């Protein structure tokens, strides 16, 4: 039966020990494993004893990795499991580590959801749908997601969302209805709900300077006209130019007037 002949502190990690059986290095263990099994020099160990020691120390390795991983920021169960799997910790050990983390409140999904909610509302321009999506991706329970997504809706101020929308609006150019449409699409992409978006848009003023709009119309007209001038006959070219400008949100009468002003059309052309 193998006998412990030496237990020494590891040089690179003072919290772990090298265990020698019959003068041969057997394995490394941490102090908790050493104490739990009351290991000491001269002690004889059966194969079953060694199996238990190895199993427990593997769990301890996983636990220490999890604690270190959790020390940087809050994590969900899913995140911890994925991390330990990458670290090649066994499924049995992972299960025991997760149980410990819940017991010691190292993993707390309600606390996680609350913290993420506060951070996102305070530091991002994202709406409740993005928050909800993040919680799903992180493996949070559906009932917790439902509760905290509703809190997100309640606590995100409408004035703050209006500021987000106005910031978006400043980056968009073109006719009023098109800018409004672009702002709406951006807010949808940022995770805001239609009821909120409509409330925000109703509070905004999309009126633009007529001179600026006229310059934009002239620029877009020239761009579309020159792009297509070699592809179509004059009548078809005018029709395509009108269609392209209307897709950009310009009004038909404004387009016709600009075409006449530019000498491209005489006012009799219609969309084919």
Swiss-Prot record:
Source species, domain of life: Bacteria
Protein name: Regulatory protein RecX
UniProt-listed GO biological process terms: regulation of DNA repair
Subcellular location: Cytoplasm
Similarity-based family: Belongs to the RecX family.
Protein's job: Modulates RecA activity.
Protein source organism: Staphylococcus aureus (strain NCTC 8325 / PS 47)
PANTHER family noted in UniProt: REGULATORY PROTEIN RECX FAMILY PROTEIN
Keyword Repeat assigned: no
Annotated keywords: Cytoplasm
Gene name for this UniProt entry: recX
This protein's GO CC annotations: cytoplasm
Family matches, as InterPro entries: RecX_HTH_1st, RecX_HTH_3rd, Regulatory_RecX, WH-like_DNA-bd_sf
């Amino acid at each position: 039966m193998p006998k412990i002949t030496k237990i020494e502190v590891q040089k690179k990690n003072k919290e772990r020990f090298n265990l020698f059986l019959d003068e041969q290095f057997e394995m490394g263990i941490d102090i908790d494993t050493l104490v739990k099994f009351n290991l000491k020099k001269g002690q004889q160990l059966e194969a079953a004893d060694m199996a238990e020691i190895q199993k427990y120390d593997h769990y301890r390795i996983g636990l220490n990795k999890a604690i270190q991983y959790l020390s940087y920021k809050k994590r969900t169960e899913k995140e911890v499991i994925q991390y330990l799997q990458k670290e090649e910790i066994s499924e049995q050990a992972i299960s025991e580590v997760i149980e410990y983390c819940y017991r010691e409140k190292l993993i707390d999904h309600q606390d996680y959801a609350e913290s993420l909610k506060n951070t996102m509302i305070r530091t991002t321009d994202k709406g409740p749908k993005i928050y909800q999506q993040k919680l799903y991706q992180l493996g949070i329970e559906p009932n917790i997601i439902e509760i905290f997504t509703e809190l997100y809706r309640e606590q995100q101020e409408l004035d703050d969302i209006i500021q987000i929308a106005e910031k978006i609006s400043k980056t968009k150019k073109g006719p009023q209805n098109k800018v409004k449409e672009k702002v709406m699409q951006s807010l949808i992409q940022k995770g805001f709900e239609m009821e909120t978006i409509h409330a925000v848009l109703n509070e905004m003023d999309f009126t633009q300077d007529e001179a600026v709009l006229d310059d934009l119309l002239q620029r877009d007209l020239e761009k579309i006209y020159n792009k297509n001038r070699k592809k179509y006959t004059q009548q078809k070219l005018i029709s395509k130019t009108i269609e392209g400008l209307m897709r950009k949100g310009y009004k038909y009468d404004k387009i016709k007037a600009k075409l006449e002003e530019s000498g491209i059309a005489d006012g009799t052309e219609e969309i084919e």
